[in-house]
Amino acid sequence: MDTSRIFPIAAEPYAFDLKPAQCALLIIDMQRDFLEPGGFGEMLGNDVSQLRRTIEPNRLLLAAWRMQGLAVIHTREGHRPDLADLPPAKKIRGRSATCIGDAGPMGRILVRGEEGHDIIPELYPLATEPVIDKPGKGAFWATDLHGILQNKGITQLVVTGVTTEVCVNTTVREANDRGYDCFVPSDCVGSYFPEFQEMGLKMIKAQGGIFGWVGHSSSLRAVLV
């Protein structure tokens, strides 16, 4: 693959011009507590199969991306063990019997260093791939993601992960405000709620692509050869 070329990728609202040398794969919050049976997501009554369907498309895209030596960055949502970075408003949000920092099936919920906070084995980062530990929904707020991307000369992002309407959408909007072009493969992002999945993707591509482009991972993989 000639990474200096521009590759038109089928997308909505119109084709996305992929520039591989300037594009990073940003995988959002594919964490055990969100995706695995018995984790925090399931404890809240959610159907984790809605998220688990994204694992295989992400695995295939990640393998193809790595094969070309392109930039990969992962994120995890979570907090310091002392919870000093956890706003009270976030702690009580949802009014669940179990809150962030409480004991869960895979350690303390959304606390850095705990089993449930870590990324699922199927997509586990290589030692050379930065992992952004973020305390909020967006991957740019209170992190060094923007600086890392600038240092790598990145101007485009392929954004995958969970959940579509929360952390993926928030990150895409943050990226858009910072001048990054974002492509979201619909099969590589997921929501516990099908209606939120649909609307989350519609919002990204609305009004001529106000926040970015929406397509399918197969279109990306077709050029990663």
How would you label these PLM feature ranges?
Residues 1-24, 33-34, 51, 60-68, ...:
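Active-site-adjacent betaalpha module
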Residues 25, 74-76:
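Glycine-rich, aromatic-flanked loop segments that form ligand/cofactor-binding clefts
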